[in-house]
Amino acid sequence: MMRIASQLTFCSPDEIMRRAVVELDEQKIITRLFSLDGNAVESAQTLFYDGILSAEIISVKEQVSMLDNLASEYNYIDLSLGIPTEIVASEKPLLLDFGTHSPEKINQIFAGLTQVISAFSIFEIIAACCYYPALVVGEGASLSANRKTKILLWEGSDLVNKRITKQTRIRGIS
């Protein structure tokens, strides 16, 4: 069993937990998700990280054949084709598709993406990379008990202003 905690845990756009522990079994299935607030002591054998925890980034392009249909429901941006000069916020949820699951490749794209997505909060960006793609491919989107997923750490972001920075990086921790 593995326990991971950080300042913030992105479960869904409507649920962002502070000081939460994600408990995973050997198969990477979440067994529990709980807050440390109100506990007299810290959870034993918990790895603490500086940043935001989320589910894994999903590439819709790798799993969905009818990408044209996405435009009616999402502000779909295919970053595997290059970084756009501008991403305009719309009524539709933003969906960022890196065309890969590799944190190294995603971090390379992030380096050039910072200015283009500066109008969006870090939580909108995490939802665009993790939550909405999971909905599209039919997986459980919320970070919750019984979900099998890799856990990512979003580090180097501005947690006070809830923005990404040029130092923002992701890495797999489970």
What are these regions (language model features)?
Residues 82-88, 104-109:
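Well-ordered, non-membrane alpha-helical segments in soluble/globular domains
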Residues 7:
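Residue-level signal for inorganic ion chemistry
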